[in-house]
Amino acid sequence: VLRPHQERAINQLRHSIKKGNKRIVLAAPCSFGKTITAVEILINVVKNGKKGIFICDRIKLVQQSLEAFDRAGIRVGVMQGDHWRTDPNADIQIASIQTLSRRRYQPIFHVAIVDECHTHYKHLTELMEKNSKVIFIGLSATPYSKGLGKHYQDLIVPITTEQLLDKDYLCPVKYYGGNHVDLSKVKTKRLPTGGVD
């Protein structure tokens, strides 16, 4: 079951797509449930007879994303070496951008969800250019990267961190820090590259 702000995000994405946008960033705070929202979006893509792909910016996030799809009971294929969940016939694929950049075979997809879209890669730009009819939805809590607007047409912000706090979806943050830290006895060494460790 989606939370109201996740449903709002999906409705705002639909509205943006109906306006003709094919490159949209969903900007949502940490703990919004961006991956859960992405799972729901891709479920609807498959229900409409289309195919989707969830693109991670790091190989490490592939497994985490797979677990979210598994919790929803969704059949997905994983594009990663000889991963035990490789299934090229699945309507939804999960892949890292690194894997996609090395593959000669590119899956067919109608909607691509790009996790952590603020870390934009050259291959992602090429993928977006080659697939001009495909809808790309970027997910980010920090969509402030220089040049991101060159790749995306619309920005959706369904809820802010403050609103999530007000609705008790997040706990208030407490900050702690020292007044003065004495680093005079900390030992450092010069690295061969010229830096300091």
Q: PLM features: residue spans?
A:
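Conserved RecA-like ASCE ATPase "motif II neighborhood" in helicase/translocase motors
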Residues: 92-127
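Conserved interdomain hinge at the start of the Helicase C-terminal
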Residues: 19, 42, 186-197
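Inter-Walker segment of RecA-like/P-loop motor cores
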Residues: 69-105
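Conserved Walker A/P-loop ATP-binding site and its immediately adjacent core
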Residues: 35-37, 44-71
